[in-house]
Amino acid sequence: KKIGYCLACYHCKKSGGVCAIKDDMADILDKMNAADVIVMASPVYFYSIDAQMKALIDRTVAQWLTIRDKEFYYIMTAAEEGDTVMDCTLECFCGLAKCLKGSVERGVICGKGVYEPGEIESKPAMREAYDMGRQV
């Protein structure tokens, strides 16, 4: 999906939640409104979310008052294994949930020590993600 960056033009505020940027975000917002559960996932880049996830979160401003009562799950991966390496990433996810009325956070999975493609396969986070998915 293609998601452009928020321009902070607030066209959405003047047009009932319709963004001036014509990309895939309108479809994503429709799906977020319709969903009961939202899973946010990102690799950790410089102790934060990646640019694509940041763009999605920022563009949610167009309908932040209509996206409500959601259950949130978070999945993060990082090359480092430290306990605090994902704190800022988690805060970015939590920040979105805090802005959406009635939302609750249900689960967090941290895949630590993964850098190369496929490394996650042997980590406990892979099984945790599977188990969490079965519970949703």
Features from the language model and the residues they span:
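Short histidine/acidic/glycine/proline-rich micro-motifs that form metal-
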Residues: V44-F46, A78-D83, G113-P117
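N-terminal beta1-alpha1-beta2 submodule of the flavodoxin-like/Rossmannoid cofactor-binding fold
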Residues: K1-A41, Y45-Q63, V104, P117-V136
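Short, glycine-/small-residue-rich phosphate/pyrophosphate-handling segment
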Residues: A51-Q52, W64-V108
